Amino acid sequence: MDNTELTVATWNTMWASGSTSRAVRVRSRLHEVDADLLVVTEGQRDLLPDGGHVADAGTHWGYDITSQPHRRKTLLWSRWPLTEVAALTTGAGAGRVLTAQTLAPVGAVRVVAVCIPWASAHVSTGRRDATTWSEHLECCDQIEQLAAQFDPRIPTVVAGDFNQRVPRRRQPLRVSTRLSEVLARWTLHTAGEVAHGPLIDHIASDLDCTLVRTWPGSDEEGRLSDHAGVVCALRPAGVG
């Protein structure tokens, strides 16, 4: 392991579960990534690598999971113990946004694990009380409010399903602009032209990025997810 770098990965696993062929292959892919910090969205704990330390954002994102009680919108796996774990419990970020800290070989790191709502969240399904993009924008506001309270001496990594392609594709300009405003304090390492992109699963931080690698949402046996996954190698500024 390179003690000067931190490996961070994220993937939306499209509710892979149980002992199905897809779930087995998804779990294998997550293991092969060998990340230090792993954010899995739309997943469950049995997909995560063995060992490590796990936190999730809870079950209250406004959809009934009675028949699938192990589902989580946002899961965080860490090679090292997690502290200061907190999840949003109100608003659009409830069950979707999780913050934690860990002490890695590169030093203390804060993680913001997210599954920002997609455009139609709670519009015609779930609570049915939202308008297009309203949940997404509210969640962005909540992430911004969290970030304003962060100790700037501790590096921050934001990872998960952002539900936007960057640069903007089809989303309204106001939605793209709002995400850019929220992310302005960090560098979005996964924006632009990358293999298997453009991505909506992203990693941003105030660390330096030395590597971005993606994998597709399918393998030789078929579909794994409707998202591509991504891993970044990060290091403190001025190291190496």
Question: Over which residues does each language-model region extend?
Answer:
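Active-site beta-strand/loop signature of hydrolases that rely on acidic residues for catalysis
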Residues: 7-13, 26-49, 111, 142-170, ...
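Structured beta-strand-rich core segments of catalytic domains in phosphoester-bond hydrolases
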Residues: 31, 37, 42-118, 217, ...
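A short acidic, glycine-rich active-site loop
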Residues: 67, 130-138, 185, 189-190
